[in-house]
Amino acid sequence: MSFERDLLRRMFDAAINAAQPAHCLPPHLPAPPRGRLVVIGAGKASAAMARAVEDHWQGALSGIVVTRYGYGVPCERIEIVEAAHPVPDAAGLAAAKRIRDVVSGLSAEDTVLCLISGGGSSLLALPLDGITLEDKQ
């Protein structure tokens, strides 16, 4: 491999590594709340971001994120739901309703950490009244 090609490869690898949620998310976590920390989110990287939060958050937390089928990662305190992307499906609709229900029950002392990445719009398909999931598909 040429010097230039090797340099470009190392730069590319460094950029990919720097963008990994486990590296870039922890410094930006919020201060511990007086109430609960509830994590919600959607997108192809949301499960990896949720895992990074779990790995670096010392206090209690809970939540739910929705990611693309096959993109889930093991989490203990944050539920990971998989749904269709780019065409929304019933799993994404159900996850969006559950996220809405979770945040509806929060108090002023609770903190919501919302993890959004690419694909979130199809993974959180909760149409307004009069619009069906089939319309969104």
Feature names for model-found ranges:
Residues M1-S117, S121-Q137:
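Non-transmembrane, aqueous-exposed alpha-helical and coiled segments at domain scale
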